[in-house]
């Protein structure tokens, strides 16, 4: 699978952008376990152009993470364009636009999944951002606003026509938030639409190696994106890669092996602290989650 010139190989598995989760230390950890591409936490376009320090620091990426995508969100076209140009200066491999975040403080203000109620503005922003930068632009969104407005099949064509390089679809509506089950049937419909030629990345409820393989085989997606299933279990990428390659599950992980992961995470966090002090607390949260999972 390729996103423009970026070759992610066969059956790539990507780390989803997650607020308060995908900080530099966690991204590097997932990369070491086989994530083919990682995404930063989403970045507010409004805060970015106001030079809010905590927001600007989210643009810190390293070569060890590549390929890496920076994701932005917002509801104003000019602001999104200006933010996109700032992001491009950070030299990510990809710029991703968030049209899928369902939380009230984002969608309730018209950004993220809130854009699913304003498709003309969504397309205007997408077109403007694509035209404003030279790096590939991708989009992440949902099936639609609610069960009566699952518009993703038509919307995917419209977004493709705006010039995006790939599309990630979370298999829920905004109304579902993170409840119920992700509907991969519509993701498969988008992928099998003969008009679509850009890569389609599926996301939602991929929590086991077996489910990952099913998503590739049954729905034909070009890549699978792992979100909440990776939190406290960054080795899920290794498990899924092994299963895709061999058809077999990895042996159960030993406590000693998990402790070594924890030790390395502490080392990485301390090293990154010298550069990105603001991320230490978040890295500690990841460590705590790892311990709780055991």
Locations of regions flagged by a protein language model:
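Glycine-rich, positively charged N-terminal anion/phosphate-binding segment
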Residues: 1-4, 9, 18-93
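Alpha/beta catalytic cores of nucleotide-metabolism and tRNA/nucleoside-modifying enzymes
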Residues: 1-4, 9-13, 19, 24-25, ...
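Residue-level signal for pocket-adjacent positions within structured domains
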Residues: 3, 13-16, 38, 43-44, ...
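Hydrophobic faces of well-ordered beta-strands that scaffold small-molecule active sites
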Residues: 13-16, 38-40, 68-72, 95, ...
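Active-site beta-loop-alpha junctions enriched in small/polar residues
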Residues: 18-20, 43-45, 73-75, 100-102, ...
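Alpha/beta enzyme core
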Residues: 32, 78-111, 119-200, 214
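Short glycine-rich, flexible loops that bind phosphorylated cofactors or substrates
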Residues: 47, 104, 233
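Aromatic- and acidic-residue-enriched carbohydrate-binding clefts of CAZyme catalytic domains
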Residues: 116
């Amino acid at each position: 699978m390729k996103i423009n010139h970026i070759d992610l190989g066969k059956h790539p598995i990507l780390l989803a952008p997650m607020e308060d989760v995908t900080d530099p230390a966690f991204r590097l950890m997932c990369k070491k376990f086989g994530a083919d591409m990682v995404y930063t936490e989403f970045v507010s376009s409004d805060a970015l152009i106001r030079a809010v320090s905590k927001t600007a620091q989210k643009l810190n990426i390293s070569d060890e993470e590549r390929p890496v995508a920076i994701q932005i969100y917002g509801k104003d076209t000019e602001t999104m364009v200006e933010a996109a140009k700032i992001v491009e200066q950070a030299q990510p491999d990809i710029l991703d636009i968030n049209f899928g975040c369902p939380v009230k403080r984002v969608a309730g203000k018209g950004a993220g999944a809130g854009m699913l109620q304003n498709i003309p503005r969504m397309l205007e922003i997408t077109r403007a951002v694509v035209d404003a930068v030279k790096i590939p632009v991708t989009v992440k969104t949902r099936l639609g606003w609610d069960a009566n407005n699952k518009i993703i099949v038509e919307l995917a064509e419209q977004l493709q026509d705006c010039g995006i390089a790939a599309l990630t679809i979370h298999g829920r509506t905004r109304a579902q938030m993170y409840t119920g089950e992700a509907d991969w049937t519509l993701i498969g419909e988008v992928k099998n639409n003969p008009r679509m030629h850009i890569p389609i990345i599926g996301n939602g409820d991929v929590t086991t190696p077996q489910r990952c393989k099913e998503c590739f085989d049954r729905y034909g997606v070009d890549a699978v994106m792992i979100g909440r299933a990776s939190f406290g279990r960054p080795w899920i990428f290794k498990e899924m890669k092994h299963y895709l390659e061999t058809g077999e599950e990895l042996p159960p992980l030993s406590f000693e092996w998990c402790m070594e992961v924890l030790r390395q995470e502490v080392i990485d966090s301390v090293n990154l602290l010298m550069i990105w002090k603001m991320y230490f607390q978040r890295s500690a949260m990841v460590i705590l989650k790892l311990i709780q999972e055991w």
